[in-house]
Amino acid sequence: MQQDLNKTIEDFNQLLSKFEAVQQAKNQLEQHVVKYQTTAEGLQVRLIERDDKLAYLQKELDEEQARHNDIAEKITALKERFGIASAQAESLAKQLEHSQANFTRKEQENQELMAKLTTLSQELTELKTTLSEKEKHFAEQQQHIEQSKQQLSTEFQNLANRILDEKSRSFSQSNQTALDSLLKPFREQIEGFQKRVNEIHSESVKGNAGLEAEIKKVLEIGLNMSQQADNLTSALKGEKKTLGNWGEVQLERALQLAGLLEGEHYSAQAHLKDGEGKHNYPDFVLNLPDNKHLIIDSKMSLVAYESAVNAEDDLKRQNKLREHIKAIKNHIDDLSRKDYSNLIGMRSPNFVLMFIAVEPAYIEAMKMDPTLFNYGYEKNVILVSHTTLMPILRTVANLWRIERGNAEAKEISARAGDIYNQICVIAERLGKLGNTLSSASSHYNSTVTALVGQQGLVGKVERFKDLSAKANKTMPNVELLHHAVESERLDVIKADTPEAQPQKDNTAQ
């Protein structure tokens, strides 16, 4: 027993010696760790400097790439604009052909209506003539009937008087019967004649009523056509205020058909001032993205064009069309003098759109004077009709839709950038936490190995349990940790963004 105790003490002393040796090795290891940490800190400083340089070079590369992308986008945009302009030119040419065809068709329909009106007028004249003749014939028949009645009445009276004179003395019942027999044919003839007169009168009244109904229908058609012609004439050659209001209504209807909203995309009769403080009221101010504007005028006079449409011969028509072109040029000169594009608060191109509400008036003017468009263009006034204005208005509506999309895209991009930066910060912090956990796990496994390994302390002190009665506890089972923290995968996120490095520096501070 003493030998065992001595051996145990000897083993314990050896164990203490080993523990001291381990402690000395640990101290040396800690010194090496301090040395390596100092070296690592120097390497970390150099690594930070290298990262800063790489970030600077990456920034320059990104800026150069952005400039290259910007130039490429501008080239692409110019190509797209060229393609759009070509397509618009083709579309405008097709629309012009379609408008000319519509004008020809409308002109043919107008000629057909005029021919129909002429035919109806002739029929009305013929019906009036027929009615007059029938009334004259009826009056003659009435006169003839009255004459016949008077003649028969006179003859009957004469006959009755003569018979009465002859038979007055010997008048008897037989004579009375004979007189009745004699007068009966005359009475029947007079009654039949009166009946026929009444029938003729009834038929004449019915015929007159039907004729009057037909005449009323013809008159109503003529009045309706006359009213429509008066309305068109009033719209074309009415007072300036009426004509201006009509043009504004047509223009505002075109704006609404293009999907534009008043107060948001355009304003009517806006009150503006020029540099001298004079008041100006443009018909319509069209709002464009980037706080820009486009002015449209709609007060074009069409009196001369209305006269040309109603001209009786081609010479008068040509003269009135020349007056129509002169009126257009006068209005162009007036708009050019007003210089709407330089009004205070206006960011408008140096031209004004001059809207001609009647499409045929625009087409006839262009056919009569092909240089008319260039005349307005040189004075910064662009002539447009409903057909040519609608593509412009639809383009403006599309620009507003694109503007809304760009604003939403910018907002989404800003929010996405913030979210991405936050994810990078979280990934960086998770990486640090993972490194700390890996280091703690490594130290834990080393300590467990030293405690429960083949040469660990547990195996060496297990014998103390048998030697001491107080050793009543059971040594718990301590196992190594085998779960590795994959913090390297987070380095991909941190390396992809140049913002991660400044954020990491801020976090470290």
From Swiss-Prot:
Residues 1-167 form a coiled coil. Gene3D superfamilies: 1.10.287.1490. InterPro entries: DNA_recombination_RmuC (IPR003798). One of its GO terms (biological process) is DNA recombination. It comes from the Bacteria. Keywords: Coiled coil, DNA recombination. Belongs to the RmuC family. Involved in DNA recombination. This is DNA recombination protein RmuC homolog. It comes from Pasteurella multocida (strain Pm70). The lineage of its organism: Bacteria, Pseudomonadati, Pseudomonadota, Gammaproteobacteria, Pasteurellales. The gene is rmuC.
